[in-house]
């Protein structure tokens, strides 16, 4: 199937969709590759497994659905299994944008914007929160980590 749009989909400073490139296909097997320029700045690859009904970050005090942001990390998320429900917000943009990311589709505010494998990326200082429903999900985050990054205060 052709992608709905092979053009770059983004709101500058908030998010960008990076399309995987079809490499080859055999009976029952599809090979897709990451664009080379996308991989040049990767400094960490995080495997993230959400069990059923997981939320990240979790409840903090009386706040059921808190946000977090990374001042020294750019996130690049690809979902390998299940669905991730992701909310993004930046002060500059001024409103929440919601995404559903699956292994083969990305929805933005309820509209299908990518009908092939894609990576949802967001830069430092973007507030985000992630949820998986009952089936859970598995993803890889190809993180760009910058000077000042410390896992102790990154989350």
What are these regions (language model features)?
Residues 117-130:
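Histidine-centered metal-chelating micro-motifs
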Residues 1-114, 134-155:
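Active-site region of the double-stranded beta-helix
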């Amino acid at each position: 199937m052709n992608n709905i749009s092979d053009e770059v989909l983004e709101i500058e400073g908030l998010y960008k969709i990076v399309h995987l490139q079809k490499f080859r296909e055999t009976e029952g097997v599809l090979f897709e590759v990451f664009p080379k320029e996308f991989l040049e700045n990767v400094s960490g690859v995080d495997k993230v497994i959400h069990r059923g009904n997981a939320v990240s970050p979790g409840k903090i005090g009386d706040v059921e659905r808190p946000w977090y942001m990374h001042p020294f990390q750019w996130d690049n998320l690809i979902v390998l299994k299940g669905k991730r429900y992701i909310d993004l917000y930046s002060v500059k943009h001024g409103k929440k944008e919601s995404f559903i990311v699956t292994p083969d589709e990305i929805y933005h505010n309820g509209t299908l914007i990518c009908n092939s494998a894609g990576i949802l990326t967001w830069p430092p200082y973007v507030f985000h929160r992630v949820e998986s429903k009952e089936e859970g999900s598995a993803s890889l985050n190809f993180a760009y980590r910058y000077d000042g990054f410390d896992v102790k205060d990154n989350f």
